[in-house]
Curated annotation (Swiss-Prot):
One of its GO terms (cellular component) is cytosol. This is Nucleotide-binding protein Daro_3028. GO terms for molecular function: nucleotide binding. Pfam families: DUF520. NCBIfam families: PRK05412.1. Nucleotide-binding protein. Disulfide bonds: none annotated. It comes from Dechloromonas aromatica (strain RCB). It comes from the Bacteria. Keywords: Nucleotide-binding. Belongs to the YajQ family.
């Protein structure tokens, strides 16, 4: 019975590359000279930290970072969970953005419900942070992929692990 999985995993190599590109742009820009503007990635905790002198500067850093991220992985900005801007020593500010990885249980339940309501001849089951979809025909599975990618637009979902 053919099957595939819906997953949502961040491309950490592409993300690290986008942050390196942004750091180089910050170093080269005239308006960032002599400021504390920088971008850091904590791969272990999956957190991006933006440092700057003001909220405006954080917005400028985001304007550099987000297109670089989108270039590496489409819709990757949607997986960021923006935390509050925090004042740190002196007049500096920082903002953390957590990288949401995997499909949480609420989204998995939503996917299963959409598949069942779509009246396709497939079965969806939640397996940890993935959703496995099984069906008798490949055409049904392709219809399921089209339904889910059209319905869920607020979070980047990938499909793979096709089996015959």
């Amino acid at each position: 019975m053919p099957s595939f999985d819906f997953t949502s995993e961040a491309d950490m190599v592409g993300l690290k590359n986008a942050i390196d590109v942004t750091s180089r742009q910050i170093d080269n820009r005239y308006d960032f000279k002599g400021t504390s503007a920088k971008v850091e990635l904590n791969e272990k905790d999956k957190v991006i930290t933006l440092w700057g002198d003001s909220d405006f500067q954080l917005d400028q850093i985001k304007d550099l970072l987000f297109p670089a991220m989108e270039k590496k992985e489409k819709e990757s900005v949607k997986r960021l969970d923006h935390q509050k801007v925090v004042s740190v020593s002196g007049n500096k500010v920082k903002q953390e953005m957590k990288i949401k990885d995997g499909i949480d249980s609420d989204l998995a339940k939503k996917i299963v419900k959409l598949v069942k309501d779509g009246k396709l001849k497939v079965q969806a089951s939640i397996q940890g942070d993935t959703v496995r979809v099984q069906g008798a025909k490949r055409d049904d599975l392709q219809g399921c992929i089209a339904l889910i990618t059209k319905s869920i637009t607020d979070f980047p979902i990938k499909y793979g692990n096709f089996r015959d």
